[in-house]
């Protein structure tokens, strides 16, 4: 008997035949056991051959741990088979073959399970390595793109290549959802593209302007994304000054620096442009005139229109023309639509001194420059109130004595006629001077004399003078000729009508 329990003895012809025959005839079970032992040896040799081929194949594949595992499995398999053979001696042959047939199937299942586990481990290691590489690459690209300009111009060719590479990497992987999440974080996808664009744009420092043309940062992979490649303007951000001069429209701004004193709305072309260009450093290209100041084009300040604060119907144009010589002006210059007004000759006083006339003109100009309000004339007597005409817009207030006579100014072409009374003119009765618009003139020639008269308005364009010597009503020309002729002789063609003989001025004249 050897170590495996097999009978190695051989039958010898000399003396051994009887023993062998005795053993054969003694029990049939011994012969059957020997046959079973031989069959078990053949089976073991066949299994060793199969196991040796499998271990050689695993050795060729380069996995060293698999060979050691297979060797252990072989040792365990042989020991288990020997134990089963020893235990099966007490059993019949049918039960032995049933036990022997089930062992190879279990070994094959165990081997397949081990191979599947190793494959899973290798695939997990490779997937983790790829994931780490992708995360490192994503971090590098994110750091690089933070300092670069952003462009959302779509590139279809690179989009297709990126999608193919992403699909090839995620085929057969159990972490497909994680990869898709990583890819979606890198790109602007679907309807949230515009919101993602604004989020990325906010991460850029505020001091740098972000341009949408010329440079590129990310590529949009979806065909439904919003395309900004054709936008011809730049997007302003915090910290970037907006140049309103380049915009095609005007930006209205509320400003309290310009105030108006009336309800009339007159457009000022330059004001809006000044308001719009206050945001930038450029100076305004057009001068601006505030609405509350009148436009001045070389005219004197006396002739400028002023605002009527008492009347809110608009701008009241009070044009005042003062003649430099004692307030005389053109005839009928203050004609208004509401009716004829008293002329400036009737409104000016008869000063005895030139200084009074200057002060009078200065007061008139000061009133017009100040607030443009109307001033009423002082009524010193009943006769003065009767002479004033209703509807006049501008009157003058002179600080002269109430008993000083007044006279209407004569047109400038009659330079010989001056306001005031003659020095030698005397009145009868109480001897007081009536408060009337007196004028005087001296006739030319050797027979000329100084006469006085009272002016009044004859029509809208003419005035008449009543002489104090005869009480005749005549034109300014006739009044000058009347002073040049002798008192006793009068021209028949002048059409002079005389007052009654009870005229105190005519009777008192020497």
UniProtKB/Swiss-Prot annotation:
InterPro entries per record: Ninja_fam, TDBD
Polar residues bias spans: 148-160, 485-496
Localization, UniProt: Nucleus
Principal cellular location given in the protein's record: nucleus
Biased composition (Basic and acidic residues): 31-44, 103-146, 363-389, 397-406
Low complexity: compositionally biased ranges: 497-510
Segments of this protein annotated with the region Disordered: 1-179, 323-414, 481-510
GO CC, alphabetical: nucleus
UniProt KW keywords: Nucleus
Induction (free text): By methyl jasmonate.
A GO biological process held by the record: negative regulation of DNA-templated transcription
Family indicated by similarity: Belongs to the Ninja family.
Protein name listed in UniProt: Ninja-family protein mc410
Organism: Nicotiana tabacum
Lineage: Eukaryota, Viridiplantae, Streptophyta, Embryophyta, Tracheophyta
